[in-house]
Every structure is written in structure tokens, then in C-alpha cells.
């Protein structure tokens, strides 16, 4: 099965701005299948950003389920996330899905895991995927030591992760919310 675990997704929040970005590489084992995949989406009337890592079909399934929860709860991010992860834990089919999501709106950044966790990370910073630790480290250093915008921090942290992680490329998609 095609995997997105070999990817990098990073989200940075500073002030009233948030940026979420990901690379475009998709691998099957140790072969690059695609270099221009779009793993970042705008949801619920462009008010919510979502990025995913994991098995491709699983990630798309979770994204669709999350969108349905957003519609049901009129775009309330936390409620939709909690309800999705509740289903994820209790549904026999969903429980087998191997993917993670980072979702963000104007106020919150959340990481949704296959274990049914809803995590709100510290420092307004979250990263997932095989290059996630590299991107998170770079982004944290940039947050602490520069005045760069969230978009610029995401871009630079993805570049650094791509220089280190063989499963992350330099083809980035970055979406932003806020002024």
C-alpha cells in the first residue's frame, strides 16, 4: 500500500497567523512514486487547514470523515476532532487506519493520531511524518530566535527536513490563515 508516513508535515502558529505545509514526495517502499502530491488541504469554507501523513487511502478516508464532522459541528474544530477520534478508536474498520492529521483553525492547532489522541501541541508548533522531528526542531529554533512569519518558518523548516530526510523532497505546499 502506498505510504505517506515517509513525508513531512509542519504547522507553525505565531500571533494571529498560522501556516501549514508539507512536501510532495510519495514513496512506495524505497521508490519515489510521485514528487508533487498535495498533502495539505483547506476545509470548511477555507477556515480550517489540514495536513496528513500515513497510508494514502487511510489519510484520504480520515480527511473525508473529518470534513463530515466539521460540517456536522458547523466548523467547530475541537468538537469535530474529538468526535472523529472517538469514532477512530471505537469503529473496527477505522481502528485499522494508519494515518495522522494536523488540523488548524484561527485559534487551535491539533494533532490527531491513530490511537485516538487529540493533542494540542506547545509553542504553536506541530510536525508529523518521517521528517517531522527535523522540521519541528528547525521550526522551534526559528520561532525562538527570529521574527519570521509562520509561512517563512514552515518553508525553511521543510527545506531543512528535505535536506536531511530522504523521504522528504523540496516540492512544498504551504497554506496560511490569519492576517
From Swiss-Prot:
EC numbers: 3.4.25.2
Primary residence: cytoplasm
Modes of activity regulation: Allosterically activated by HslU binding.
InterPro entries according to UniProt: ATP-dep_Prtase_HsIV_su, Ntn_hydrolases_N, Proteasome_sua/b, Proteasome_suB-type
Binding residues for Na(+): 162, 165, 168
MF term (GO), any: metal ion binding
Keyword Cytoplasm in annotation: yes
CDD domains for this protein: protease_HslV
Pfam families from the UniProt entry: Proteasome
Family statement: Belongs to the peptidase T1B family. HslV subfamily.
Entry protein name: ATP-dependent protease subunit HslV
Protein's organism: Bordetella petrii (strain ATCC BAA-461 / DSM 12804 / CCUG 43448)
Amino acid at each position: 500500500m502506498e505510504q505517506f508516513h515517509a513525508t513531512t508535515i509542519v504547522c507553525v502558529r505565531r500571533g494571529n497567523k498560522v501556516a501549514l505545509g508539507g512536501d510532495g514526495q510519495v514513496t512506495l517502499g524505497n521508490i519515489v512514486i510521485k514528487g508533487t502530491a498535495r498533502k495539505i488541504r483547506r476545509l470548511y469554507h477555507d477556515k480550517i487547514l489540514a495536513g496528513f501523513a500515513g497510508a494514502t487511502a487511510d489519510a484520504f478516508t480520515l480527511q473525508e470523515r473529518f470534513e463530515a464532522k466539521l460540517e456536522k459541528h458547523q466548523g467547530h474544530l475541537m468538537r469535530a476532532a474529538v468526535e472523529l477520534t472517538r469514532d477512530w478508536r471505537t469503529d473496527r474498520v477505522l481502528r485499522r487506519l494508519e494515518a495522522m492529521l494536523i488540523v488548524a483553525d484561527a485559534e487551535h492547532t491539533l494533532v490527531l493520531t491513530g490511537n485516538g489522541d487529540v493533542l494540542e501541541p506547545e509553542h504553536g508548533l506541530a510536525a508529523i511524518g518521517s521528517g517531522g522531528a527535523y522540521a519541528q526542531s528547525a521550526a522551534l529554533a526559528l520561532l525562538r530566535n527570529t521574527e519570521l512569519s509562520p509561512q517563512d518558518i514552515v518553508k525553511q523548516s521543510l527545506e531543512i527536513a528535505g535536506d536531511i530526510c530522504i523521504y522528504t523532497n523540496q516540492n512544498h505546499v504551504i497554506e496560511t490563515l490569519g492576517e
